[in-house]
Curated annotation (Swiss-Prot):
Organism encoding this protein: Rattus norvegicus (Rat)
Keyword Coiled coil: yes
PANTHER family linked to this entry: CLATHRIN HEAVY CHAIN LINKER DOMAIN-CONTAINING PROTEIN 1 (PTHR10292:SF11), CLATHRIN HEAVY CHAIN RELATED (PTHR10292)
Native organism taxonomy: Eukaryota, Metazoa, Chordata, Craniata, Vertebrata
Keyword presence, Translocase: no
Annotated coiled-coil segments of the chain: 118-239
Keywords for this protein: Coiled coil
Protein name: Clathrin heavy chain linker domain-containing protein 1
InterPro entries: ARM-type_fold (IPR016024), Clathrin_H-chain_linker (IPR012331), CLHC1 (IPR017212), TSNAXIP1_N (IPR032755)
Superkingdom in the source lineage: Eukaryota
Amino acid sequence: MPTQEVKKHAVLPPIISRNDKEFLESMQRYIITETKRVGCNEEGPPDEYYTIYRNVFDKVIDYVNAYKSVLTSIKKEYDAFIETVKKGRRNAFYLHGKLKVLAAEPTALVYHQRRTIQLEAKMRIIDNNSKAIQLQIDQMKQLRMEYENTEVKLCASSKQLWKPIPGMTLQDSVNLDALNNHKQNLEDKCRKLKQDMSTMYVSAQKKADLDEEMIVLLKRRDIAENLNKDLRFRHQRLQVISHTLNSWMKQNMRIPFKDVLERIQQTKAIYGHAKVVDELFEDDPNKTKEAIVMLYYIERFHELISLGEYEKAACFAANSPKRILQNAGTMNKFKAIGKVRGKPLPLLLFFEAIFNTSQAFKRAINVDLTLEGIKCGLSEERLDLVTHWVTQAKLTFSEKVGDAICAYGEQHPYHKSKCLALAQIVYNECGLHKKAILCLCRQGQFHEAMEHIQQSKDINTDDLIQLITACPQIDLIRGLTEERNGKPPFLSFGLTVLHLFSVDMKKIGMKLLQEVSKAEKDVIEHLVMSDLFCSIEKWQELANICLQNGFKNLSNDIMSILRSQAGVSEISEDDTTNVMEHVFW
């Protein structure tokens, strides 16, 4: 066989084993699957391609043991080449950006130079304007100094030359006809004012003269009433005598005249018995007229109620003589009506009428009507009416009235401050100074509250403790525990803090301790030494509280101040020293 034929048969492709074929197919599937997963196209991105084929290369190296060292060297060179390519790309990108920056520098320099020229031009303009303004200011100052140094005297007539005439335009002020009309109007107004002064107003001397004249007339009236009473008594006595004589004449004078005279003398009316005189000689016409008027008011009131004229009925009740219709019965009538659709509440109309007319009477409206009226106004959301009644009407206040207003303020936070102010007025009128001070504190008016406490004599320490419990405000507690105008504080600082910690107001107590801890030691010493009500044991208890709540320095300061006092020593619990030993020896 020729040599060429032998070589031709020798280069036949080797037969691939089944395992190698499956391995190659799995690698091919892996490449396709990973390429689709990362979304690579045929042109890139290259980094994902490099990663996929690097993994395939690693698997091939692991699979082929015979060529592992050779393939590992090839892969190492392959990775080095790829890293060199990547580094070259990064350097190219960096150099490209740097090249752009270098190319843009001349343009930026030109822009900056142009902007510099513009700003310098603006600065020159501003400097010129500033110099001009400064020059004007200097000129004005010079003129003002010259004006102040020169005494200028103007005539009284020349003062009005530059002022416009009130009620006239500049054009009318130079028109003679308009000026004449304006003058005529002013003269008419002046004439009317003089007439009003003579008819509508009187001088204080005139009032004094009228008062004296009234006193004289009242004296005349008293004299005339006494004379009238005497004359009526005489008239009554003559009537009795006349009646007796007429009866005697009708009986044909069968009784002796002497007996008739005795019977006349025995009549009490002849001698003016007090009871007979009072019954017979009262002002009967006036009493009768007054009773008729009262009866008319009552009948008319019931008639208006039956007709549904509740507003008129309320006015009738308010204007009734001697307040005969301003009572609980009338209030119950209006309350029984209830609400009327499309109209104000009849009960509110009743209270509005009687409260608005209360100033016309000497006596104030009683407590029950006042309380019911305030409650009615608050239930109808008419705080404006309640405000007017409390400040202007003549009412009889009570503690329940103030409590009702405070409760309304708690239910309506928007009106709380106004309700507290009204309740304060009520409590002051009732003499309830504790509740009035609480209202001031809830309004944040702590300075006024301090003044009120200082003026009140019936407020003690327990009341102030209750006050800070009901209104735990730092400013209030600070005002109660600080000296005022050289006077000792109202409350002991130490006892106050201990009380706050005992009633679950730890936050307020912590704030007070925090403020004190920021002060100097001499201030703390003054606070401890000037506190006359807090004993040493209480201060030690307060120091322990400070230590438990993180105020170690304050606790140490308090204890050092206590130890520095003469005759004061700290005794531990384990010490067996007898405190009263010196007494028995």
